[in-house]
A protein has these predicted regions:
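N-terminal cap/recognition module
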Residues: 4-107
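Acidic carboxylate diad motif detector
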Residues: 62-231, 374, 378
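Short, charged, low-complexity amphipathic alpha-helix
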Residues: 1-16, 305-315
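Short amphipathic alpha-helical coiled-coil/interface segments
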Residues: 25, 65, 141-149, 320-327, ...
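Stable alpha-helical structural segments in soluble proteins, enriched in small hydrophobic residues
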Residues: 32, 140-152, 453-463
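Generic detection of short hydrophobic beta-strand segments and adjacent strand-loop junctions
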Residues: 4-8, 208-215, 279-284, 415
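Positively charged, helix-rich recognition surfaces that bind polyanionic ligands
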Residues: 233-486
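Short amphipathic alpha-helical segments
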Residues: 17, 21, 133, 137-144, ...
Length: 486
């Protein structure tokens, strides 16, 4: 899949359409959530103990199911009548395959409302939010709510079996507090059209088309869907196409491997087993961007809340929205530049697989100093890994993510053991080398190496999908090349 993003401001002719649909999507999702939660709590109580809202919701649900079942019976009988009047072998076959579909009423033990039940209840009862929304956009909002609940049920079952995987017990899906939620159009309600060498989207019930740019950009792709999400005072239109590309699979016997260590001072550190010098991409632009963002945001919030209670005052402004948009776009730009440099380097050196180090929940309870903590947790490393995966799929280079605990502390040259952090019964490991200053690691024999390159080498070693014996013989990973991307 490939997604194009477009920012839409208040000057756009479709601003009202996007405002209405994102606000209604939020209402629809909250309404579906409200029905599910009240049916859950209401059926667990006796009729005398139920609250007014629980009684009202249960009445709406039972009435809606009754009406939907009655309509289903009428449609079934009408279809049978038409088929019998038509006669013939084909009608007889269709008639034998025709089935009456009816909804079951929720019970104390089986209380969950599926998408089909919610959609039928809102449709036959004429719910105002459901009826005023664009076709299929309302149904997609219900689907997202039901999907959130199913994910919750799955997480609860997994939590019961493996509580150590979670920070806390999963909670039931909550209500959306923002003014809007992501609205989702299918390729039937937001249709793609080409005219005069350009591509346009035509939304249902809207006369004004939305221009996507040159038609040549989308040649050979299959249009899938369009999503519109609130984005710091603007709207971001995400148009998804099927480019028929899948992530490349790891070869059975890879020979050339590239280890990547993601960090802060050095955003990327890469080292391979094929003799080329390792390189590091400086993280200065990312740190400077975050520092500027935090400083400017503090100034704007201070001016906005001056003379009022900071906890309960209004903290939204056009300047804050513009600042957040600028920071997000700049961060995305830096990450994609890093990803493209890394993947072009990999293609140039015929790399068989890229191994990226990561730590699960690495930002939880981190303690690397007050200033480093602030800088580290502000960088969306998950987004950087996703950018690398996206570019790798385009260039068909396999990418593997490897758990990297202790890779920065262990000595690559001394073959130190690197267990998984947090394992039960783990004895704290002792390492042969140590970091003697910022960015420099010294092994047992006194040999010095760039600390981040040592981490990248250990990530390759921990992945253990190819032999690194040649690196120990050659010793050509001492001095990395520094790359500046801004």
């Amino acid at each position: 899949m490939r997604t194009w993003g477009f920012n839409v401001n208040k000057n756009s002719a479709l601003w009202k359409c996007f405002s209405r649909n994102t606000a209604d999507t939020r209402c629809m999702r909250n309404t579906a959530n409200f029905y599910i939660r009240n049916v859950m709590t209401g059926l667990r109580k006796s009729p005398e103990e139920r609250t007014h809202t629980e009684t009202e919701v249960l009445h709406e649900v039972f009435t809606g199911i009754q009406k939907a079942n009655t309509l289903a019976v009428e449609r079934y009988r009408e279809n049978l009548r038409k088929l019998r009047l038509a006669g013939g072998m084909k009608s007889a076959v269709v008639c034998s395959c025709l089935k009456l579909k009816q909804f079951s009423y929720p019970t104390r033990t089986n209380w969950f409302l599926s998408y089909e039940v919610l959609d039928a209840v809102f449709k036959v009862t004429g719910h105002p939010v459901y009826c005023r929304m664009d076709s299929q956009v309302n149904q997609n909002a219900i689907r997202k709510t039901v999907k959130a609940w199913k994910s919750y049920f799955k997480a609860v079952r997994d939590y019961a079996a493996h509580p150590e995987k979670y920070q806390a017990k999963p909670r039931i899906p909550g209500y959306i507090r923002t003014t809007g939620a992501t609205a989702w159009w299918t390729n039937q309600t937001a249709k793609l059209r080409f005219r005069d060498g350009k591509a346009y989207l035509r939304f249902v019930n809207e006369k004004q088309p939305f221009c996507l740019g040159k038609a040549s950009l989308f040649e050979g792709f299959t249009y899938v869907k369009t999503e519109v999400q609130p984005f710091h005072g603007h709207f971001r239109v995400l148009v998804t196409f099927d480019d028929r590309l899948k992530e490349a699979s790891v070869p059975e016997h890879p020979e050339r491997i590239l280890g990547v260590d993601i960090g802060l001072t050095n955003l990327l550190s890469a080292a391979g087993n094929f003799g080329d010098a390792p390189f590091v991409v400086g993280g200065g632009p990312v740190k400077a961007l975050n520092q500027w963002f935090n400083k400017r945001k503090a100034e704007l919030l201070s001016a906005l809340t001056r003379g009022s209670d900071s906890k309960h005052s209004h903290k939204e402004s056009h300047a804050l929205d513009a600042l957040s948009r600028k920071r997000d776009d700049a961060m995305t730009d830096i990450f994609y530049k890093c990803a493209w440099y890394l993947l072009r380097y990999a293609k140039k050196n015929q790399v068989d697989v890229i191994v990226i180090g990561y730590n699960k929940a690495q930002k939880q309870d981190i303690s690397i100093g007050k200033q480093n903590n602030q800088a580290f947790v502000s960088v969306p490393y998950g987004k950087l890994r996703q950018c690398i995966r996206t570019v790798a799929a385009k260039l068909q280079v396999p990418v593997v993510e490897q758990e990297e605990s202790y890779t920065s502390m262990a000595s690559f040259w001394d073959l130190d053991e690197m267990p998984v952090y947090g394992e039960a019964g783990l004895v704290p490991p002792v390492f042969s080398g140590r970091r003697i200053c910022r960015g420099l690691y010294q092994d047992r024999s006194g040999r010095r190496i760039n600390a981040d390159v040592n981490g990248a080498l250990n990530i390759m070693r921990k992945c253990n999908i190819v032999s690194l014996r040649a690196l120990y013989d050659r010793g050509d990973v001492d001095t990395p090349v520094r790359i500046r991307i801004a």
